[in-house]
């Protein structure tokens, strides 16, 4: 496994391969990331991963400085997963002095996470565009856990005619249903025990829908009641939305509705979703 830091090194290595799969990460890897790397390797023959904690997608009072980092562990996990090349650029490599170009996606960035994290998706869209430009992947792999992010990425890839296939893989969960996330490491034992309430709220919604409930507001209320049973859970939002436009629904009259939520447990903000 090669480990490189510069754009030039990535481009030089990329020339030897016809097809590559790409998994962009912010490091502190878990089984969800590694499953993407394994899928990338299986489908393309070559897997490239990046590790870059992207400062432009963090707000001024968010956790950029404290975001968990463990490079030696990450590299060992990537090698074991069959990764061929790891790109670990510096902030200066991605955003050199004088950098002043950003990718702004309208519409789908407005609700949900976008409404609560101003500038977040501008940072995501800009860095992913630059990573794609450098790596030139055949396919790029993302997890369904960051549902709005997947919609945003698919939007700009389509709008800007980027020659990459975006593959969305199912959320990988702990045994108790908690979606795997690097930020789960912030939770203490009591908070970790409370965190599966997000998945319980999602499964309550799914069960109600399967039983014939199509009133979106009734399902939102059911989710809020489920979350209210956990004293440590502070609800940011619950959403039942169209999976493409991300606009809230009043009636569920279609397959593939996106049910999502954001909840604070202590100081840690967790997100999760399912498509029903």
Swiss-Prot record:
Output the HAMAP family linked to this UniProt entry: PanC
Sorted alphabetically, which Pfam families does this protein's record hold?
Answer: Pantoate_ligase (PF02569)
Protein name from the UniProt record: Pantothenate synthetase
Q: Which Gene3D superfamilies match?
A: HUPs (3.40.50.620), Pantoate-beta-alanine ligase, C-terminal domain (3.30.1300.10)
The entry sums up its family as follows:
Belongs to the pantothenate synthetase family.
What is the annotated quaternary arrangement, including any partners? Homodimer.
Q: Give one GO term, molecular function aspect.
A: ATP binding
